[in-house]
Amino acid sequence: MARVKYGKVTRARRKRWIKLAKGYFGTKKSSYKKAHEQVIRSMAYAFIGRKERKRDFRSLWIVRINAAVRPEGLSYSTFMHGLKLANININRKMLSELAINNSEEFKQIVQQAKKALNK
């Protein structure tokens, strides 16, 4: 049987990992072993980061809503409870956008929530 050499295949596979390590510092971008280890680690960090981003944005929206509601004399939690009682189903992302860009419309929503709380 003829001898099989995997030079081209191995080189192509290694080049793929080196390509993924583009922009890394030192030997992590050029040495296959270091690049492979760092790319695996980077992918793990990226996976975790995609989960954390959802949490971070939700907390940012909550902070923005709270900051917009405080001058109206409500806390975030009472405001959200008022929205629930008033049957207003707007998610936190949209509420924070309204608070930043359309403050008049947001104030109307706050008034409706206050009205529902007083009933």
Swiss-Prot record:
Gene3D superfamilies in the record: 6.10.160.10, Ribosomal protein L20 (1.10.1900.20)
PROSITE patterns for this protein: RIBOSOMAL_L20
Domain of life of the source: Bacteria
Gene Ontology MF annotations: rRNA binding; structural constituent of ribosome
Key word Ligase present: no
GO annotations of cellular component type: ribonucleoprotein complex; ribosome
GO biological process: ribosomal large subunit assembly; translation
Keywords: Ribonucleoprotein, Ribosomal protein, RNA-binding, rRNA-binding
Keyword rRNA-binding: yes
Homology family: Belongs to the bacterial ribosomal protein bL20 family.
HAMAP family in the cross-refs: Ribosomal_bL20
Function description: Binds directly to 23S ribosomal RNA and is necessary for the in vitro assembly process of the 50S ribosomal subunit. It is not involved in the protein synthesizing functions of that subunit.
Record's protein name: Large ribosomal subunit protein bL20
